[in-house]
């Protein structure tokens, strides 16, 4: 597609996909992806990074919650990576976990992050998993 992704074209862009891997960096785009994936019945694999922490979840899948049910409001101005920064390798770690979640869904492995939020701390290598 040779266009900007927005709410006017989200359904058309995503309608022939089986999974959406969110690699965006802002709430507005994630909310648009969430709305479209929910309407189309397509899982959304969310990944977010801020400073030394990354979050991963699978939304709109196996009766799990949507992105906006867990993150109803944006606080982007407070949590801006331009001012707070992130450690450079964190996005690749989070992206790899997102790819793993996509593979698990494709091959039918039920032990995925639907209904859970995985939080990874790059400084301590601590992983916390929260039931949503």
Predicted stretch roles:
Residues 9-19, 23-132:
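Glycine-rich phosphate/adenylate-binding loop
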Residues 1-10:
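Conserved SAM/SAH-binding loop
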